[in-house]
Swiss-Prot record:
Segments on the Extracellular face: 43-49, 115-125, 186-187, 254-259, 318-319
Keywords: Arsenical resistance, Cell membrane, Membrane, Transmembrane, Transmembrane helix, Transport
Topology Cytoplasmic: residue spans: 1-21, 71-93, 147-164, 209-232, 281-296, 341-357
Protein's UniProt keywords contain Nucleotide-binding: no
GO cellular component assignments: plasma membrane
A Pfam family that the UniProt record links to this protein: SBF
Protein known as: Arsenical-resistance protein Acr3
Transmembrane segments: 22-42, 50-70, 94-114, 126-146, 165-185, 188-208, 233-253, 260-280, 297-317, 320-340
Main localization (coarse): membrane
PANTHER family noted in UniProt: ARSENICAL-RESISTANCE PROTEIN 3, ARSENITE EFFLUX TRANSPORTER
Functional summary from the UniProt entry: Catalyzes arsenite efflux from the cell.
Membrane topology type: Multi-pass membrane protein
Molecular functions per Gene Ontology: antimonite transmembrane transporter activity; antiporter activity; arsenite transmembrane transporter activity
Amino acid sequence: MGNENVVHEGKGIGFFERYLTVWVAACIIVGVAIGQLLPAVPETLSRWEYAQVSIPVAILIWLMIYPMMLKIDFTSIVEATKKPKGIIVTCVTNWLIKPFTMYLIAAFFFKIVFQNLIPESLANDYLAGAVLLGAAPCTAMVFVWSHLTKGDPAYTLVQVAVNNIILLFAFTPIVAILLGITDVIVPYDTLFLSVVLFIVIPLVGGYLSRKYIVQSKGIEYFENVFLKKFDNVTIVGLLLTLIIIFTFQAEVILSNPLHVLLIAVPLTIQTFFIFFLAYGWSKAWKLPHNVASPAGMIGASNFFELAVAVAITLFGLNSGATLATVVGVLVEVPVMLTLVKISNRTRHWFPEVAREN
């Protein structure tokens, strides 16, 4: 029985997923090479930006999110709201724990461990950038991580929606308290544009597509034929996004390699810590894997568009705080893909079906 399960699981892994580590490494190399050897490419792409949101990246994120939105049965959203445990895990982890552990971990590394490598003023800037990341849980990419771990799409949507509502009110006071800054300005155009681009548009598109296909072709065709056409769309979109991100940041990586690595250390540790905290809590509460995995992923990943925009507004484009938020962008995808792999390999820790979420 055990061997059959292993064989079945191996067959279920697609070509892209099986060699995802190789593809990610290749995309990072390609992205940095393009940014360095063909500087006109990132320069041209950077013109297609509004409210700190890259339009090319937004299009690719649509490609990644759309397949998951197709799977949402909207009657299940109402059911998801009746099972609050997964939402409680997400909200408590994201808003009562994550910002403060980010501050402590980042301060420990920047001000103590790396004090001989980073000047004090720069350490304070890096700490500020880390806090901005820690106070902004993910809005868009969490749908990708949920999709890759077979998360419940309807429940993930509810988790993200609740976090976005809290974000509107909690981000500013948390950042102000941790950084001692009273004039924190939240770029609401970035916030609202991201919600519209990365949640509302894919959600409406998925709903209309699902409704049309089911009515015209039937639910069996939709689930067994139509959905399968999108099997590799998310992975391809993810890899192309990775190339664009590293194309944009090639100069930062090559001009500050040591500081990029130093900043990446506490950000990576924080990401793993928050994921395992929420994931372990979900296991203790006997939540199903398709709720536990997204709960861990939302807190582990960050709303980097918002963090970068606030860093630029408060500290300036060339500040250490902005560099720290940019490094957050660089490490997020490779680290989150590692967590996706861990989540998929520990699926057997969780009950198949939970009576109460």
